[in-house]
Amino acid sequence: MTLTASSSSRAVTNSPVVVALDYHNRDAAMAFVDKIDPRDCRLKVGKEMFTLFGPQFVSELQQRGFDIFLDLKFHDIPNTAAHAVAAAADLGVWMVNVHASGGARMMAAAREALVPFGKDAPLLIAVTVLTSMEASDLADLGVTLSPADYAERLAALTQKCGLDGVVCSAQEAVRFKQVFGQEFKLVTPGIRPQGSDAGDQRRIMTPEQALAAGVDYMVIGRPVTQSVDPAQTLKAINASLQRSA
């Protein structure tokens, strides 16, 4: 579905669904995007697509009415991370993220870089523990905490730095809502409708389970992008979430 809209007049959606665009072919990506409605989801653009197609690709998605989560996971010295986050805000994206493991000074600098944008600033989210990581992966890095405990430690640091929320696994959402409050946004990848393949995610939930756990925004990729009828798949997911609410 093609709409004409600027980044300042993006279509508004109440859906918590964020579709991950993981394509290496621009035409294939746009063919998919033109099948879905910006009222049914937001879109996530990650490292591969942004590196291949650049800021213009983000602008084209916005012109079709979509809010964009720019998933580049900035992790650098504070000044560089701050400039990168400000550049994302200049693009008019809805959400941008950094790695919480970059530390307090980096996250604080990123937050401060968004102050001049006022109400037009994107949500600033920090990545805690990648959902593909298990305890053995953390142990290889010298981290003796469980993924859940380490994610909570990083989430606490994120909130202390004044960011809007974190990317976390759905399993961590219940505790995070209790500890950090309702206003602290939880963004969760690894969401798979019932019957979907787990893919490369290790800690997964269905959309209904994620909503019940307190997830604010759920990232769904292949179950939608590889669907024979992605528009209908999105509508079915949103309908199931409304029934569960």
From Swiss-Prot:
<dbReference type="GO" id="GO:0004590">
    <property type="term" value="F:orotidine-5'-phosphate decarboxylase activity"/>
</dbReference>
<keyword id="KW-0210">Decarboxylase</keyword>
<dbReference type="InterPro" id="IPR014732">
    <property type="entry name" value="OMPdecase"/>
</dbReference>
<feature type="binding site">
    <location>
        <begin position="71"/>
        <end position="80"/>
    </location>
    <ligand>
        <name>substrate</name>
    </ligand>
</feature>
<feature type="binding site">
    <location>
        <position position="131"/>
    </location>
    <ligand>
        <name>substrate</name>
    </ligand>
</feature>
<comment type="subunit">
    <text>Homodimer.</text>
</comment>
<feature type="binding site">
    <location>
        <position position="201"/>
    </location>
    <ligand>
        <name>substrate</name>
    </ligand>
</feature>
<comment type="similarity">
    <text>Belongs to the OMP decarboxylase family. Type 1 subfamily.</text>
</comment>
<feature type="active site" description="Proton donor">
    <location>
        <position position="73"/>
    </location>
</feature>
<dbReference type="InterPro" id="IPR047596">
    <property type="entry name" value="OMPdecase_bac"/>
</dbReference>
<feature type="binding site">
    <location>
        <position position="22"/>
    </location>
    <ligand>
        <name>substrate</name>
    </ligand>
</feature>
<dbReference type="InterPro" id="IPR011060">
    <property type="entry name" value="RibuloseP-bd_barrel"/>
</dbReference>
<dbReference type="GO" id="GO:0005829">
    <property type="term" value="C:cytosol"/>
</dbReference>
<feature type="binding site">
    <location>
        <position position="44"/>
    </location>
    <ligand>
        <name>substrate</name>
    </ligand>
</feature>
<dbReference type="InterPro" id="IPR018089">
    <property type="entry name" value="OMPdecase_AS"/>
</dbReference>
<dbReference type="InterPro" id="IPR013785">
    <property type="entry name" value="Aldolase_TIM"/>
</dbReference>
<dbReference type="Pfam" id="PF00215">
    <property type="entry name" value="OMPdecase"/>
</dbReference>
<keyword id="KW-0665">Pyrimidine biosynthesis</keyword>
<feature type="binding site">
    <location>
        <position position="221"/>
    </location>
    <ligand>
        <name>substrate</name>
    </ligand>
</feature>
<keyword id="KW-0456">Lyase</keyword>
<dbReference type="GO" id="GO:0044205">
    <property type="term" value="P:'de novo' UMP biosynthetic process"/>
</dbReference>
<comment type="function">
    <text>Catalyzes the decarboxylation of orotidine 5'-monophosphate (OMP) to uridine 5'-monophosphate (UMP).</text>
</comment>
<feature type="binding site">
    <location>
        <position position="192"/>
    </location>
    <ligand>
        <name>substrate</name>
    </ligand>
</feature>
<dbReference type="GO" id="GO:0006207">
    <property type="term" value="P:'de novo' pyrimidine nucleobase biosynthetic process"/>
</dbReference>
<comment type="pathway">
    <text>Pyrimidine metabolism; UMP biosynthesis via de novo pathway; UMP from orotate: step 2/2.</text>
</comment>
<feature type="binding site">
    <location>
        <position position="222"/>
    </location>
    <ligand>
        <name>substrate</name>
    </ligand>
</feature>
<protein>
    <recommendedName>
        <fullName>Orotidine 5'-phosphate decarboxylase</fullName>
        <ecNumber>4.1.1.23</ecNumber>
    </recommendedName>
</protein>
<dbReference type="InterPro" id="IPR001754">
    <property type="entry name" value="OMPdeCOase_dom"/>
</dbReference>
